[in-house]
C-alpha cells in the first residue's frame, strides 16, 4: 500500500480489507520477513547480542517484533508531511470505532496513555489548569486517586506524574470512606484483577455511586482480542493499552481510549502543545499510522489459528524436554496478563544436576542465544508467544541438549 493510499483512507474510507484482510497469510504464521533485514548488520557491527525470545513481550527485551505491514507503513508515510493534530483526529476516530470508544488517540506507550488520561480528567480542556500540572496545591483541581492496595505497582508513577496522591483501599467500604471532595478518579489495574478484592464490575459500580470517572490499565491484557473493546463496553472512562506486545505495532506507541471529554483533555496535555505535562511524550506521524494499521490488522487476524499455533509450539518443546528421563512438563495459560499457552519444565535434581538458574544462563550464553525465564531450584518457564516460525524447534533441541548433558 502506498503512503498516499493510507492517508487517503483516513479521510474517505477504512484501509481496504482486500489489502489488509484475510486474503493475506496470517502474520502469526509467517512472522516478519527475513528479507526486511538491511545489508548492514548493525547488531553485529556494534557487538549487540540478539536472541530467540522464549519469554514474552518484555520491554527491556525490546517487546515484540513489528509485522512487515507496520514497517512498510512507517517507511511509506515517512515521505510526506501532514498536520499532527489532523492526523490524531482522523486516526483517533478510526481507533475509537474499532474499540467501541467515544474517542481515542495514539500515545507514546501505555505509560504515556495513563499520564495523559489522568491529566485529561484533572484539567479537562482548560489551558490554565494544564499549565499548572503537576502542581495541584491551590490550583482548584482535584488531587486524589483511589486504587486497590493489591494494584500497587511501579507503573502507577504514570498517574503520579500529574501530581496526584494515590489512596489505597481493600474493600468497598474502604472506597466509600476514602471518597472526599479531593477525589479525582478511581483507577484499576487490569492485570491485577485476580489479586484484587474488588472486581472490575464492582469497581465501576462504586465509581458510578460516587459520580467518579474510572480508569483501567490493560497494557498487558491482550490477548484476548475482545479486551480491546470489552472495557470500553463496560463503561470505563479511559482505557490505556500498549501498542507493542500482542498487537505488534511500534513498541514505543500506545493507545488511549475513553470519553470524548477525557480524550479532549488528554490531547490538550499532549504534543504538539508545549505548555503541558505531556510535551516530552512525542509520537511521530509514522508511529501513529503504524499503530493504526497494526490495530486494524490485528482485529482481522484469525486468532483461533494463532492460538493453535502456540499450542503446537508448546507440544514440540514439551516432547523434546520429556524425552530426557527425570523431566516433567506442565502446560498452562496465565489467567490475565500474557494470556497465551506457556510451558513450565521441571526436573528431578537427583537425576539431572543443574539448577533452573544455571539452565537459563546456559541457554542465554549459547548460540543462538535463548532467553527463557523462571529459574530457581529445578525448573524454567518458556513462552513460545514471540518466537518466529521454526524457532520452537531450536528451543526444544537446546533444552533437550542441556538437560541431557546434566543427566547423572
Q: Over which residues does each language-model region extend?
A:
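N-terminal secretory signal peptides
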Residues: 1-2
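A glycine-/small-polar-enriched, mobile loop at the entrance of the PLP active site in fold-type I
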Residues: 52-90
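Flexible, glycine/charged-enriched surface loops at secondary-structure junctions
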Residues: 84-89, 103-104, 278-281, 301-310, ...
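A common structural junction motif
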Residues: 273-274, 364-370, 401-406
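Conserved C-terminal alpha-helix-loop-beta "cap" of PLP-dependent enzymes
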Residues: 42, 320-398
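Structural signature of PLP-dependent enzymes
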Residues: 295-319
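N-terminal export signals
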Residues: 5-28
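Conserved PLP-enzyme active-site core in the AAT-like
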Residues: 7-10, 14-15, 34-52, 56-61, ...
